[in-house]
Curated annotation (Swiss-Prot):
It comes from the Eukaryota. GO terms for cellular component: centrosome; cilium; cytoplasm; cytosol; intracellular protein-containing complex; membrane; mitochondrion; nucleoplasm. The active site is at D176 (proton acceptor). Disruption phenotype: Mice die in utero 8.5 to 9.5 dpc due to severe defects in their vasculature: embryos show neural tube defects, mesenchymal cell death, and vascular abnormalities. Extraembryonic development is also severely affected; the mutant placentas exhibit defective labyrinth layer development and the fetal vessels fail to invade the placenta. Male mice specifically lacking isoform 2 are sterile. A specifically deletion in liver results in hyperglycemia with increased gluconeogenic and lipogenic gene expression due to loss of AMPK phosphorylation and subsequent dephosphorylation of CRTC2/TORC2. Residues 398-421 are annotated as: Disordered. Residues 45-90 are annotated as: Sufficient for interaction with SIRT1. Phosphorylated by ATM at Thr-366 following ionizing radiation (IR). Phosphorylation at Ser-431 by RPS6KA1 and/or some PKA is required to inhibit cell growth. Phosphorylation at Ser-431 is also required during neuronal polarization to mediate phosphorylation of BRSK1 and BRSK2. UV radiation-induced phosphorylation at Thr-366 mediates CDKN1A degradation. It holds the Pfam family Pkinase. SUPFAM superfamilies: Protein kinase-like (PK-like) (SSF56112). The lineage of its organism: Eukaryota, Metazoa, Chordata, Craniata, Vertebrata. This is Serine/threonine-protein kinase STK11. Belongs to the protein kinase superfamily. CAMK Ser/Thr protein kinase family. LKB1 subfamily. Its main location: nucleus.
């Protein structure tokens, strides 16, 4: 018998196979019949913070929701990779500057820095901030008009001026005031954020003269668009706040251009128009804040004394609500940490043998909000001379209790999955440095 002969083997020839069709041999399953098992969300602890879902992502890094396992406060953490910061011009310097500025600021309308954690092994920094439910730009983009009702815009603008006045009183020029850097809490409190390009004036400076600017082009004043070497820092913030007010009340920008060169050319000339429906009081305030000459431009005191600022505006239109979450479409913006809490506590008894969740080792709490480094410890020799020896310390002044490779006796190691570790011990796990 010929092996190549298909008949004795009960096989079809190529022609017969094509005539019968492949559907006879391959059973097709409709997608509606497939039951998809969602991937289990695995809990992860960074220090004492339980990680939630992604809130947003920018050029510097990701922002995630976290829960403080000690206070149960809802927070947001900005995750920064040192490798990524090196690729951004002035990236590391801007982050360091922002941390140094935020640690000294305490105001209702300025974002608060709660904690800074650093993982030396993974070269990651975690900036833990107070939680804000939404950004102003996100709210503007959620409505077709791209603007707020006058009553709502007035309330936000008053808070912006309060926060800006506080920053200026501390000798800080923000340099990048815009809706994208203004965040909102659940109760409508405005928070000025993103101080990465801000400048702290010298304590004994005679004026507010600045020489550099890295702000968003559409919000820059004529003196920067025209390339002046020096300019008034406070008046730059007044101009940017004026452009912001123009934008949130009209849905437009006072100056536009097809590219940055055209945009700066239009800003440099200083010619703009205000829509008629703004009304005389608001138009007068906008012209004062967008004055071409910095010396004639409104100060914060003049803004506070203006009739539009002091007036109580009636609620003529429906307020713009906080939009649903862009990913989950959750209109209430519920806590994304809840599924991870269930994984953390709900399955501990059933899966005692497993490593139920991840804890990043080597976390260092830097309570003065700078990156950990080395300091020199003076040791006096027999000849009376001092010898400086490098000694690794946490920046809060405490010595590390443990190396990332050395574990104390009797303490469960999270790096070894074979060991049984109860969830309560993992939650209470101390960082590599003593907290003061």
């Amino acid at each position: 018998m010929d092996v190549a002969d298909p008949e004795p083997l009960g096989l079809f020839s190529e022609g017969e196979l094509m005539s019968v069709g492949m559907d006879t041999f391959i059973h097709r399953i409709d997608s509606t019949e497939v039951i998809y098992q969602p991937r289990r969300k695995r809990a992860k602890l960074i220090g004492k913070y339980l990680m939630g879902d992604l809130l947003g992502e920018g050029s510097y890094g990701k922002v995630k929701e976290v829960l403080d396992s000690e206070t149960l406060c809802r927070r947001a953490v900005k995750i920064l990779k040192k490798k990524k910061l090196r690729r951004i011009p002035n990236g590391e310097a801007n982050v360091k500057k922002e941390i140094q500025l935020l640690r000294r600021l305490r105001h209702r309308n300025v974002i608060q820095l709660v904690d800074v954690l650093y993982n030396e092994e993974k070269q990651k920094m975690y900036m833990v901030m107070e939680y804000c439910v939404c950004g102003m730009q996100e709210m503007l983009d959620s409505v077709p008009e791209k603007r707020f009702p006058v009553c709502q815009a007035h309330g936000y603008f008053r808070q912006l001026i309060d926060g800006l006045e506080y920053l200026h009183s501390q000798g800080i020029v923000h340099k990048d005031i815009k809706p994208g850097n203004l965040l909102l809490t659940t109760n409508g409190t405005l928070k000025i954020s993103d101080l990465g390009v801000a400048e702290a004036l010298h304590p004994f400076a005679v004026d507010d003269t600045c020489r550099t600017s890295q702000g968003s082009p559409a919000f820059q004043p004529p003196e920067i668009a025209n390339g002046l070497d020096t300019f008034s820092g406070f008046k730059v913030d007044i101009w940017s706040a004026g452009v912001t007010l123009y934008n949130i009340t009209t849905g437009l920008y006072p100056f536009e251009g097809d590219n940055i060169y055209k945009l700066f050319e239009n800003i440099g000339r200083g010619d703009f128009t205000i829509p008629c429906d703004c009304g005389p009081p608001l138009s007068d305030l906008l012209r004062g804040m967008l004055e071409y000459e910095p010396a004639k431009r409104f100060s914060i005191r003049q803004i506070r004394q203006h009739s539009w600022f002091r007036k109580k505006h009636p609620l003529a239109e429906a307020l713009v609500p906080i939009p649903p979450s862009p990913d989950t479409k959750d209109r209430w913006r519920s806590m994304t940490v809840v599924p991870y809490l269930e994984d953390l506590h709900g399955r501990a008894e059933e899966e005692e043998e497993e490593d139920l969740f991840d804890i990043e080792d080597g976390i260092i709490y830097t309570q003065d909000f700078t990156v950990p480094g080395q300091v020199l410890e003076e040791e006096v020799g027999q000849n009376g001379q001092s010898h400086s020896l490098p000694k690794a310390v946490c920046v809060n002044g405490t010595e590390p209790q443990l190396s990332s490779k050395v574990k104390p006796e009797g303490r469960p190691g999270t790096a070894n999955p074979a060991r049984k570790v109860c969830s309560s011990n993992k939650i209470r796990r101390l960082s590599a440095c003593k907290q003061q």
